[in-house]
Regions:
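Transmembrane alpha-helix boundary and packing residues in multipass membrane permease domains
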Residues: 23, 27, 39, 76, ...
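Short runs within selected transmembrane alpha-helices of multi-pass transporters and secretion channels
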Residues: 71, 139-158, 169-177, 195-208, ...
């Protein structure tokens, strides 16, 4: 019988990739939700409905980001507590995070449904797009609690040493989404509403399946126990995981700015082309995010156990893997630009040509993105939410916003597609500076004789 990989193990490249592989696949399937919606809506409901989804997606992703914030910050706290040998307290923290997520999800769901129309108008919905924006946004927001729970469990299942269970739940949700999209959008011709219902029901599968698992007797490292909400650990988790929320909010703001700029300079086709780029980026970046989510509990555990040698091992291997991943993804993005554009917008020759061109310019961003995502996640796992948030804030809100606004003014309008790449280069410099600045505090660049084996 194959031996289960434990957080306390020493990780070789093979063992590390085996442990994080379910998380990577899990994130890819999660990203497929929006991609499949966009694919079916674009081909069966038209480019106006497709543009409407792209316009409201930033708002929806902010709500999902809150789940990631609680999940990553809470997992760092729970993993560190496990590393310190305090099992009962780890279970209490875990249960507290799940309860808080469920209650907050219901509140945000109601708020999103009620205020979807003014939100769509604020995001710049044209009269032609408005009703589609409101319809899609309200239906998807009705499932916010399940969406947030799904994002939270993605992190906690890894800390519970059950990454394959997380993968199974996410694959089940992804298959549900694709099957229902085919049925509701292509079969019943429900249009944008069918895509929204398919997404919402798939999120229920991804969020409620792990909840049922933890409510029953199980063999994982974590248990749901009776608990009450406590301000200090909740603030600790939310503060530490704030970089994930910051990243989602900032990315959403950048997407809004991109849409505004593209509507101004290129028109509705620019928004649709950007939508295709974002969908493909979701899948590509999911590889880096999945890796970072997968190794974060390992980092948190060994930080709690004061095993400095293993921290150094994790950092070295992760940096090399992220560099290799960036090179491969950049080449793939360039090679697959035409077939992927054809898949989404092949019905419109002008839009197809624009999307292919934009895709090739945009692809260089993947060279640097993985390293920056890992650096932010690494500091979250170490309990330093401030630096993690700073990397995310500068990478997305500051550098990307500045690039989107300034590049078309200084250079050609075409250079707006380079904005993300320029931002990632500056973010890489910041990440390297922070890693070197904090090396003595966390000892991840030295083999400490005091580290435990």
């Amino acid at each position: 019988m194959k031996q289960q990989i434990r957080l306390s193990d020493h990780f070789t490249y093979r063992k590390l990739l085996q442990f994080v592989f379910p998380s990577i696949i899990m994130m890819i399937f999660t990203s497929i939700y929006g991609v499949v919606d966009g694919l079916f809506v674009s081909n069966f409901a038209g480019k106006t409905a497709f543009a409407a989804i792209n316009l409201v997606m930033p708002f929806i992703m902010v709500l999902g980001g809150i789940g990631f914030m609680i999940g990553t910050g809470g997992t760092a706290l729970v993993s560190k507590t496990l590393g310190e040998g305090r099992q009962e307290e780890a279970n209490r923290y875990f249960s507290m995070m799940i309860l808080f997520t469920a209650l907050l999800g219901v509140l945000l769901s109601v708020t999103g449904v009620v205020f979807m129309r003014p939100v769509a108008l604020f995001l710049g919905a044209t009269p032609e797009m408005l009703e589609d924006c409101v319809r899609y946004g309200r239906i998807v927001n009705a499932f916010t609690a399940a969406f947030m729970l799904q994002n939270v469990f993605q992190s906690f299942l890894i800390a519970a040493e059950k990454p394959k269970l997380g993968l199974a739940a996410t694959v089940a949700a992804g298959v549900t989404n694709m099957a229902l999209d085919a049925l509701f959008v292509a079969g019943f011709r429900w249009g944008i509403a069918g895509a929204a219902v398919a997404t919402g029901l798939s999120q229920c599968v991804g969020g409620l399946f792990p909840l049922v698992y933890f409510l029953r007797p199980n063999s994982s490292r974590l248990r749901l126990v009776r608990t009450r909400l406590e301000l200090r650990p909740l603030l600790n988790a939310c503060g530490n995981g704030s970089s994930e929320l910051m990243s989602n909010i900032s990315s959403s703001i950048v997407s809004m700015l991109y849409n505004f700029q593209l509507l101004k300079y290129i028109g509705e086709d620019g928004v649709s082309a950007y939508g295709v780029l974002m969908y493909v980026q979701f899948i590509f970046i999911a590889i880096d995010i999945g890796y970072s989510i997968g190794c974060a509990p390992i980092v948190g555990f060994h930080y709690g156990a004061q095993n400095h040698a293993e921290l150094k091992n994790m950092l070295k291997k992760s940096v090399l893997l992220m560099c290799a991943s960036g090179a491969v993804l950049t080449v793939l993005a360039s090679v697959l630009a035409a077939p992927l554009a054809k898949l989404f917008v092949g019905y419109d020759e002008g839009l197809y040509t624009l999307t292919c061109h934009a895709f090739r310019l945009f692809s260089f961003a993947f060279l640097f993105a993985g390293f920056n995502i890992f650096a932010s996640s690494f500091f979250t796992a170490l309990g330093n939410g401030l630096i993690s948030a700073a990397i995310s804030f500068l990478r997305t809100l500051v550098f990307q916003t500045a690039s989107v606004l300034i590049l078309p003014l200084i250079f050609d309008v075409d250079d707006i597609w380079y904005a993300i790449t320029v931002a990632e280069v500056f973010a890489t410099l910041i990440s390297v500076i922070f890693l070197f600045a904090k090396r003595k505090k966390y000892h991840y660049m030295e083999c400490s004789p005091h580290g435990k084996k």
